[in-house]
Swiss-Prot record:
It catalyses: tRNA(Ser) + L-serine + ATP = L-seryl-tRNA(Ser) + AMP + diphosphate + H(+); tRNA(Sec) + L-serine + ATP = L-seryl-tRNA(Sec) + AMP + diphosphate + H(+). Pathway: Aminoacyl-tRNA biosynthesis; selenocysteinyl-tRNA(Sec) biosynthesis; L-seryl-tRNA(Sec) from L-serine and tRNA(Sec): step 1/1. GO terms for molecular function: ATP binding; serine-tRNA ligase activity. The keyword Ligase applies. PANTHER family: SERINE--TRNA LIGASE, SERYL-TRNA SYNTHETASE. This is Serine--tRNA ligase. Consists of two distinct domains, a catalytic core and a N-terminal extension that is involved in tRNA binding. It is found in: Cytoplasm. Its EC number is 6.1.1.11. Belongs to the class-II aminoacyl-tRNA synthetase family. Type-1 seryl-tRNA synthetase subfamily. One of its GO terms (cellular component) is cytoplasm.
Length: 438
């Protein structure tokens, strides 16, 4: 959530920056904001006047009583009672206005950092660097579906059990998928200093509100009503949501917490399934594992000092890149433009891995600095050197999406006979195997 003081101080500048993002007209109703702010200011001024008058009358009552002027004192008491009624009405309306402003701000995305390229959509993204050279094959390249099905990828069973965009893995490919996740989590903990966490896969609305998925993106989530306890009926609003990413529970570790400055940075990682409705993705990537309702991901989260967050962004991007480098998968790093960034991000890098069957790079990781946007919703703070509470900055990134990494391994390491060479980094997790074959 944006700092309302920033909007009060320089609304025009904030709106200009918001207008560089996707669908700017949906972000902030400037006229409604200004109207509420004008009413708030007027009410606050009137409230202060009433409080001052009440205080003066209260002093007068004591003086009048001391002088024995009982009738005048009673008249002053009556006026204080009248002022209290008006003060109560003002306080009620002020609370309503604050609630309306809060609701309005919950729908407003983060402001892009000055270094973010301006663009309307993904065509405006800028390549920062690339690593590795795509392999040249001397046979017809198959996509991951054709490579993976003989090895245990079962899309028909996924449809039978759950519907479209679900996949079943069996045998050697299931083991390779597990090996990838284990390799990633070991790399992030052993080499990069993250603390491994096991998190709930269902969270409450407050958690999703804190990280920015609610209330604006409820349609992207899977909701499940909580079961009643001891035969009690279930309230309509007693919902849990399946996590769209482990970023949600990990970042919420610091909700309503004040940490000591010397505890920063806090570096957390988790391997979890992720659940997404993929609303708005009808007809896109319908073949294979690229876009699924359920997929595994190793997530990285850092909670840092505000002055260190852009340094942390570069570090985290490097941590995601390390996975691809150790697997020998060619990739490029893209700096997302203003029109392609996620709702809560101030700056984002996407890692895109080379997929030979598509002859292109596809997203496999996003790493974002949210600055204080999530922390303000979460009230996640640290005590600074002056002893004052200050909002932390939060960052999150994929390290990596396991399913898409499996896709990249199958396509980049395929052989003419249908087998798949297992990358060296994964062989310790595969019992020393060098080949995956049916």
């Amino acid at each position: 959530m944006l700092d309302i003081l920033l909007l009060r101080k320089d609304l025009d500048s904030a709106v200009a920056r918001l207008e560089t993002r996707k669908k700017p007209q949906a972000f902030l109703n400037v006229e409604a904001f200004q109207s509420l702010e004008a009413e708030r200011k007027s009410l606050q001024t009137r409230t202060e006047e009433l409080q001052s008058k009440r205080n003066q009358l209260s002093k007068q009552i004591g003086m009048l009583m001391g002088k024995g002027e009982k009738d005048a004192a009673e008249a002053a008491k009556a006026e204080v009672g009248s002022l209290k009624t008006e003060l109560d009405q003002s306080a009620t309306r002020l609370e309503q206005i604050q609630g309306e402003l809060q609701t309005m701000l919950l729908a407003v995305p983060n402001l892009p950092h000055d270094s973010v390229p301006v663009g309307a959509d993904e065509s405006g993204n800028v390549e920062a660097r690339r690593w590795g050279t795509p392999k040249t094959f001397d046979f017809e390249v198959k996509d991951h579906v054709d490579v993976g099905q003989p090895l245990g990828l079962d899309f028909d069973m996924g449809v039978k059990l759950s519907g479209s965009r679900f996949t079943v893995m069996k045998g050697p490919i299931a083991r390779l998928h597990r090996a990838l996740a284990q390799f990633m989590i070991d790399l992030q903990t052993d080499s990069h200093g993250y603390t491994e966490c096991y998190v709930p896969y269902a969270v409450n609305a407050d958690s999703l509100k804190g990280t920015g998925q609610l209330p604006k993106f409820e349609g992207d989530l899977f909701a499940a009503k909580k079961g009643g306890q001891d035969g009690e009926p279930v309230p309509d609003n007693a919902a849990l949501y399946l996590i769209p990413t482990a970023e949600v529970p990990l970042t919420n570790f610091v909700r309503d917490v004040v940490v000591a400055e010397d505890q920063l940075p806090i570096k957390l990682t988790a391997h979890s399934p992720c659940f997404r409705s993929e609303a708005g993705s009808y007809g896109r990537d319908t073949r294979g594992m690229i876009r699924q309702h359920q997929f595994d991901k190793v997530e990285m989260v850092q909670i840092v000092h505000p002055e260190k967050s852009y340094e942390a962004l570069e570090e985290m991007t490097g941590h995601a890149e390390a996975v691809l480098q150790k697997l020998g998968l060619p990739y490029r790093v893209m700096s997302l433009c203003t029109g392609d960034m996620g709702f809560g991000a101030a700056k984002t890098y996407d890692l895109e891995v080379w997929l030979p069957a598509q002859n292109t790079y596809r997203e496999i990781s996003s790493v974002s600095n949210c600055e204080a946007f999530q922390a303000r919703r979460l009230q996640a703070r640290f005590k600074n050197a002056q002893g004052k509470n200050e909002l932390v900055h939060t960052l999150n990134g994929s390290g990596l999406a396991v399913g898409r990494t499996l896709v990249a391994v199958l396509e980049n390491y395929q052989n003419a006979d249908g087998s798949v060479t297992i990358p060296e980094a994964l062989r310790p997790y595969m019992g020393g195997q060098t080949l995956l074959k049916a």
